[in-house]
């Protein structure tokens, strides 16, 4: 049931996101206690409170019309955060061009941590530019990856 709701919300969000030039990062539907539907969106030019409000108003109205969640719930729409932990492969495409920190399972060039600019993904590799050099990291060698915020 939870996954069905998430999939239906994704479908409903797609035209709204495209209209506003936004990308969907993640959807969480938590049912412990009062249910919470969390939608994380990303604007490559910088996610604003206006982006979140715009999506919240529109998806909230659509959800009310569809009566997709038949109980009282809380809707939260937000940016993914400055130092978000990347949870799925698609996020490496979404956050291309952002600073990233990757903790490795096995060292690459004697390093356990790679920090640099995310260049994207190719096949089963993540490409990071670290100190002017391109580093290819196999997905299976990534223990953890987070966006990095540089002050």
Swiss-Prot record:
Pfam families: DUF150_C (PF17384), RimP_N (PF02576). SUPFAM superfamilies: YhbC-like, C-terminal domain (SSF74942), YhbC-like, N-terminal domain (SSF75420). GO terms for biological process: ribosomal small subunit assembly; translation. One of its GO terms (cellular component) is cytosol. Its main location: cytoplasm. InterPro entries: Ribosome_maturation_RimP, RimP_C, RimP_C_sf, RimP_N, RimP_N_sf. The keyword Transcription regulation does not apply. CDD domains: YlxS_C (cd01734). It is found in: Cytoplasm. Required for maturation of 30S ribosomal subunits. HAMAP family: RimP. Belongs to the RimP family. This is Ribosome maturation factor RimP. It comes from Persephonella marina (strain DSM 14350 / EX-H1). The lineage of its organism: Bacteria, Pseudomonadati, Aquificota, Aquificia, Aquificales.
């Amino acid at each position: 049931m939870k996954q069905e709701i998430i999939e239906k919300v994704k479908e409903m969000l797609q035209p709204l996101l495209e209209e506003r030039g936004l990308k969907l990062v993640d959807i969480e539907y938590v049912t412990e206690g009062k249910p919470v539907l969390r939608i994380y969106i990303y604007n490559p030019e910088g996610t604003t409170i206006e982006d979140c409000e715009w999506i919240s108003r529109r998806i909230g109205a659509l959800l009310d019309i569809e009566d997709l969640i038949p109980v009282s719930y809380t809707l939260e729409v937000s940016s993914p955060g400055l130092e978000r932990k990347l949870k799925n492969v698609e996020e490496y495409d979404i956050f291309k061009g952002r600073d990233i920190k990757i903790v490795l399972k096995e060292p690459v060039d004697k390093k356990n941590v790679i920090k640099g600019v995310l260049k994207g993904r190719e096949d089963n590799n993540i490409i990071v530019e670290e100190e002017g050099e391109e580093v290819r990291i196999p997905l299976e060698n990534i223990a953890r990856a987070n966006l990095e915020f540089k002050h």
